[in-house]
Amino acid sequence: MDFPAAQPKPAADGKIIYYPPGVKETTDKITNDEVVKRLKMVVKTFMDMDQDSEDEKQQYLPLALHLASEFFLRNPNKDVRLLVACCLADIFRIYAPEAPYTSHDKLKDIFLFITRQLKGLEDTKSPQFNRYFYLLENLAWVKSYNICFELEDCNEIFIQLFRTLFSVINNSHNQKVQMHMLDLMSSIIMEGDGVTQELLDSILINLIPAHKNLNKQAFDLAKVLLKRTVQTIEPCIANFFNQVLVLGKSSVSDLSEHVFDLILELFAIDPHLLLSVMPQLEFKLKSNDGEERLAVVRLLAKLFGSKDSDLATQNRPLWQCFLGRFNDIHVPVRLESVKFASHCLMNHPDLAKDLTEYLKVRSHDPEEAIRHDVIVTIITAGKRDLSLVNDQLLGFVRERTLDKRWRVRKEAMMGLAQLYKKYCLHAEAGKDAAEKVSWIKDKLLHIYYQNSIDDKLLVEKIFAQYLVPHNLETEERMKCLYYLYASLDPNAVKALNEMWKCQNMLRSHVRELLDLHKQPTSEANSAAMFGKLMTIAKNLPDPGKAQDFVKKFNQVLGDDEKLRSQLELLISPTCSCKQADVCVREIARKLANPKQPTNPFLEMVKFLLERIAPVHIDSEAISALVKLMNKSIEGTADDEEEGVSPDTAIRAGLELLKVLSFTHPTSFHSAETYESLLQCLRMEDDKVAEAAIQIFRNTGHKIETDLPQIRSTLIPILHQKAKRGTPHQAKQAVHCIHAIFSNKEVQLAQIFEPLSRSLNADVPEQLITPLVSLGHISMLAPDQFASPMKSVVANFVVKDLLMNDRSTGEKNGKLWSPDEEVSPEVLAKVQAIKLLVRWLLGMKNNQSKSANSTLRLLSAMLVSEGDLTEQKRISKSDMSRLRLAAGSAIMKLAQEPCYHEIITPEQFQLCALVINDECYQVRQIFAQKLHKALVKLLLPLEYMAIFALCAKDPVKERRAHARQCLLKNISIRREYIKQNPMANEKLLSLLPEYVVPYMIHLLAHDPDFTKPQDVDQLRDVKECLWFMLEVLMTKNENNSHAFMKKMAENIKLTRDAQSPDEPKANEKLYTVCDVALCVINSKSALCNADSPKDPVLPTKFFTQPEKDFSNDRNYISEETRVLLLTGKPKPTGVLDTVNKPLSATGRRPYIRTTGSETGSNISVNSELSSSAGNRSREQSSDISETGVSENDENPVRIISVTPAKTEPVKNKEINSDQATQGNSTERGKKRTATASGTENIHQKAEENNADETGPSLAAKTRRGRPPKPEPQGTTAKNEETNKPPVRGRKRAAASQESPGSLEAGNAKAPKQQDTAKKPAAAQRQIDLQR
């Protein structure tokens, strides 16, 4: 390039400065504008020069040095500085690789100067931006800053440069600017000897969240820079984290407090940046500082959980160490670990297996928040994709639906409901996913069995929003309900039925409240209204607060007539679902307060409205259900598609309609609905027909007047069902006729007369339905049929049917058989007993001899163990059925006050002893019937005392069930007394504490209690007393402990009304009183206070105290008292009281059994336990008897001395259907040794063992309990006594008489002498070895 001759100017140091042609000398003497003008020409000159122009380079060297003078570097004018910087950049380019500046200080000043000029890059709209860009481009291209490596303090320049570039980068810069910046910085990092901490900080600071949010472009620039220089910068990063994490030198950097944020960002940029850091994190996970562990867990949770992370597979030791933090002692650490699991499950399904076990443990964490978050974690992942959560994880959520904390239960229930709606209702992931969560509907409805009102309300809400969404169109909603009901398990169906029943009950309470508003104000009206408000409040969450809100709502109702009319419409039987929705919104709008965003009063009212509003069922809905069922009958429905067979759909549909007929009867009243039901009546399925009759019975009150065509078709069908249908159909048909027809007398007579004439005991299979029909007819229309029935009862039922055994039962030793195996004759006899009861219940007359005769007959049935004729023709299982029927019959009659009066104490005791029957099913079913009647307050209080005898039950589950029954009954009675203030005389029949005298009297007459001073017998008495007293003494309400003590003391001042002049009877009574006093005194320190009132004793059981009679005697010795209280166990394996021979009437013997001993009847875990301690809640190791069937006739005892671990017994009720099903279970399969022919169900399996038993296992005397071994030489002597005892015969001279009539059944049997002797020690040794 040719330059014109330059104009030389003398420099300050004497050297001549050559300026480019046309450029005058640039000094501080000229203006800034002139300086700029001249510098622009200089810039142009240097810009055009290249490195090869040696002459020019030499010529302009002084100028280059001059431009680095203080005048230019410190010039206040930014344009001057920019132009100088551009010149200097070009000078470095031209003179590269050597700079013309030899002074290190000057070089440092120059580069700091250039760096400062780079700040001008910030404003892209500046007219000078292109020059700034040129400056950056030039520096980056030439790598000018690499010159600084020679400087000692080059780091200061680099730090300033990096900070400048990161501060100026912004979103208005194009890609070229960013690339030049990257080139500039990366060359410094990669070509230097290392990166100092300060320089590293200048990069890393841009990754901190606060800075990252302020300048996203700086973050991106740092990210790309780190990626580009990863190999060079990684050791520097590792050193930094090592200093901070391992050595704890937080002072090395201002970023020390942000290390975990930095690790997270660096890992996202490139995991290789942290190759050396990860092991340091494993070290930190084990820190003693909980907060430090928490910070590391938070960090690693993000690292492991991020979507593209493969850290868990790349670094297994760190992953395993991290999983260990799920079990950290520090609660926040465990909480953080659980929260992480959700992201991990969603982003890394392959790690679910590793997480499952840890989540299982945390689902039982003592901290509520952690259990809650486990649920949230699993449900969140499940809602994203069901395949992300395995069955085990869903199982954890299922468990938590029963958590002790409401927040956790609610989360679990709502989570499962959402999954069900998504995958079952909407089928978003196909049939397999729907099948995977199909159990949810059952589980959620099962929760309705919980006692908490919050649980019940949430189940109702879930049902209305998730299981059968109420906002669906009617047809869709009913289809959803129809197939849901068909696919529910039996317990879920019961829960759903109970839910509708509770809602209907609450509707009726609100209806009654509105009726009270219509009545004139009075004191009685106010009291009734208050009681009704308290009842309504109990059906709402937090009953305490609810009472105040309900009272307030009641005031509003009283003042606002329009609101009352809206509420009346809402609960009226004709209210449609759409109307209900409008009413609820209207009432809520009226009660809303705009000034009060959170209104607890309104929330409570909404709860009430949601419970009573008919959001699912109305006339249109019932019509839609019936159409669906018709389609199932015709075979045109989608039954198979919905996973239900047509038969199941039809049966379930009818059952559903039957339940709804109780709660919404008005909605059924249409010809179309009834036509469909008539079609069901003609179907072969007995259950379907039975349900259809029930629906007619519940809903058909207007059929006669409004639908004559339906009436004329229905009558002959009902007649046919009453005569020849199944027993259940017959019962429903008779009740249906009585309920819906005005000429019921004529209709019933047309059934009664032909049936009563055609009774034939020789064909028992044809007797059952007629006996059912006749019994219900005589109960429903006693005035018309009581007299004609009397002759049927006397001539046929008693004389011909009950007093004769026409067939011989199967002698297989079973104590129970399934329903289908029971002989028709016994089924007929059971129905005959029920007929007697129904006939008497209809008459309600205790003046006639019929009631007494029937009670004597039933007593005779119990005394004779079910074999009324005592001809030994009836089988053991049939005898069990008849004993159960007789005991249940007495209990049923006792529910009618007029018959309760004439039931003698002896008959009551016989009835009570059924709960100690040798047959498991008899005990089970009788206890359920007893509880059902007591809980409805139908039975007198004395019958609750029967549960005390359950302490003797050999099966733990039965004891547990009895205890639950007691808890329920006592709480119901106490609640009833609170809600219904009453006079003292009524308290006698309701106050639970008044059960004590009945219990004492019952135990004093226990046939097992023969020797008042026998310690083992007294221990049994004590166990029975404590079984009841423990529940009664849970709380000392109104000084009840002292009251019970006073009752026991007062009994000692009376005599036994049953046998007032018999010293032994009175001694036994007083002894039981002393045992009761002993127990009460030992268990309560509060019983020594004075009783607030003097208890009244029942005169039926105790005489009036005599004025001059005092009874200070102690009937149990101090030694005995100590033995009873210390609970010294009886000798292992020997239960003297249980094993003694039969000693009184009405007692069926049985043995203490283990879980395998209920004899193939039912699967129950139970152990033989000593009588010490509370048998309902044994916690100790029990001696386990194996190889005995409780229901075997002649069981053989094989005693194990290994302590058996007790299993917790769930307190559940088992209904009679389950009892029969239980016979098919696999309990007690093969026994080590057993008597031939004694196995209750698995007889064939046992026959192979019969030959192994040998002569020593000959048939024993007693069913159900092993006899005591006798000394040698007594075998012949006892051949007679080894025969089964004949029970119920009269004493001595009268022993040959046969009970041929009702009167004979009233005879008492003598107490037999205890002929069995105690086992010898040697014999016991043999038993144990066996």
From Swiss-Prot:
It is found in: Nucleus. GO terms for cellular component: chromatin; nucleus. The keyword Cell membrane does not apply. Residues 1160-1171 have a biased composition (Low complexity). Gene3D superfamilies: Leucine-rich Repeat Variant. It comes from the Eukaryota. Disulfide bonds: none annotated. Residues 1138-1330 are annotated as: Disordered. SUPFAM superfamilies: ARM repeat. Transmembrane segments: none annotated. Keywords: Cell cycle, Cell division, Mitosis, Nucleus, Repeat. InterPro entries: ARM-like, ARM-type_fold, Pds5. Belongs to the PDS5 family. Interacts with the cohesin complex. Binds chromatin in a cohesin-dependent manner. This is Sister chromatid cohesion protein PDS5 homolog A. It comes from Gallus gallus. The lineage of its organism: Eukaryota, Metazoa, Chordata, Craniata, Vertebrata.
